[in-house]
């Protein structure tokens, strides 16, 4: 029986039946993310080629995709504290997924909109990422609650792996539609089907999960819940500063896709398949770093700046083979960033402040993404200088991260065997 049990955050053994019950909500959120990522990540590799088709330059592509990522991250500073104050975590989660479900299929209209097509596409691309900003802090609080008993490193990694499975299936679906029709409009329109499926599953999950979510999430706001300053420990802020620098160096995939189709000679229909490969690499990176995090702590994140520094010399190389390798490195880096980083924040911050913490942290990442979009767009034609700039940014990120890891009172090894610290 011991082989069929696992340990909860309190350190007690969980029988197989209870294990399935504890993992059920985690898998449920993962399936919602799977369907939603078929939509969002199915469209994402076409952002650069679509904007280029509509007349955008490398600078415009960099700014639009950078602004989209900045919105996805930076606006969480608004929606994270808002979710904490109101405790309406489900409302924000539903609204955010709904915005993505609307914006992405409407990209089908952009090539048909004439001179307004570039503006329409830019607004919808950014709108999709605004939806992510609305839902992400609230959804992550819900996910942090349901992963507490199964180990946050593993829980977030399993959820992220399902999420990334959708990010693989979406581009494969888009590639198949492009191969069959040659039309980006048809490809975007097809994504209305998984969008509807994601919303159906989310409403179904809403009816079943409340009993699995700790009272701390659904309770009325405690006194002083509108004061996020309690999450601003020195270690947390240093960690966020490191995130600014690594985000500034992590190129948006729209720029990579622009490069692949305009410089490396890769057909547009192949780009979604390359993105699918990147998401497979991201899933492996998320799982590996999650397991290492649970066993060895936050030092697992030191690999992130090193991976990011390797992206531009590979992904923006003129040779397609090197560019393909760079896409895989890019995917691995995003997998670590999107899963293990969140697990650490959940362990650093009390439950009543996690929405605020995710929002504040994401604001640093968003500011970095916006700066990075401008950096890549303006230096795209001077790649040696771009490679040097990214290397310097990642050296700074690595150094600040090392200091942050010393400042943070190291979250205890084996987070799956501990409760949150209530600093």
Regions found by a protein language model. Give the residues of each.
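Juxtamembrane intracellular "pre-TM" segments in multi-pass secondary transporters
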Residues: 2-23, 207-242, 417-423
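Symmetry-related core transmembrane helices of the 12-TM Major Facilitator Superfamily/SLC fold
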Residues: 186-204, 387-404
């Amino acid at each position: 029986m011991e082989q069929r049990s696992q340990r909860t955050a309190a350190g007690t053994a969980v029988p197989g039946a209870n294990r399935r019950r504890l993992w059920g909500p985690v898998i449920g959120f993962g399936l919602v993310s799977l369907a939603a990522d078929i939509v969002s990540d199915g469209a994402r590799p076409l952002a650069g080629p679509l904007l280029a088709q509509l007349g955008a330059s490398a600078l415009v592509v960099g700014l639009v995709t950078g602004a989209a990522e900045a919105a996805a991250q930076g606006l969480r500073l608004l929606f994270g504290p808002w979710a904490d104050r109101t405790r309406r975590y489900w409302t924000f989660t539903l609204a955010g997924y709904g915005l993505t479900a609307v914006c992405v299929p409407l990209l089908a209209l952009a090539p048909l909109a004439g001179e307004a097509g570039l503006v329409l596409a830019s607004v919808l691309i950014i709108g999709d990422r605004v939806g992510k900003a609305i839902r992400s802090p609230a959804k992550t609080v819900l996910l942090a609650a349901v992963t507490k008993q199964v180990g946050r490193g593993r829980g977030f990694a399993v959820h992220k792996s399902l999420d990334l499975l959708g990010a693989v299936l979406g581009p494969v679906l888009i590639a198949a539609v492009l191969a069959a029709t040659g039309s980006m409009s048809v490809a975007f329109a097809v994504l209305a089907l998984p969008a509807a499926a994601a919303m159906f599953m989310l409403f179904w999950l809403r009816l079943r999960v409340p009993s699995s979510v700790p009272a701390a999430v659904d309770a009325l706001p405690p006194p002083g819940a509108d004061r996020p300053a309690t999450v601003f420990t020195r270690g947390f802020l240093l960690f966020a500063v490191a995130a600014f620098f690594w985000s500034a160096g992590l190129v948006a995939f729209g720029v990579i896709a622009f490069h692949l189709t305009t410089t490396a000679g890769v057909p547009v229909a192949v780009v979604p398949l390359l993105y699918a490969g990147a998401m497979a690499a991201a899933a492996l990176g998320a799982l590996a770093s999650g397991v290492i995090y649970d066993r060895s702590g936050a030092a697992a994140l030191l690999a992130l700046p090193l991976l990011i520094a390797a992206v531009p010399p590979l992904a923006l190389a003129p040779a397609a083979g090197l560019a393909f390798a760079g896409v895989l490195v890019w995917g691995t880096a995003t997998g670590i960033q999107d899963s293990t980083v969140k697990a650490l924040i959940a362990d650093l911050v009390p439950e009543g402040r996690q929405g605020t913490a995710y929002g504040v942290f994401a604001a640093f990442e968003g500011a970095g993404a916006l700066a990075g979009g401008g950096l890549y767009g303006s230096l795209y034609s001077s790649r040696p200088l771009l490679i040097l700039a990214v290397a310097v940014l990642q050296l700074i990120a690595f150094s600040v991260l090392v200091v942050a890891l010393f400042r943070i009172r190291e979250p205890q090894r084996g987070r799956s065997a501990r409760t949150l610290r209530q600093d």
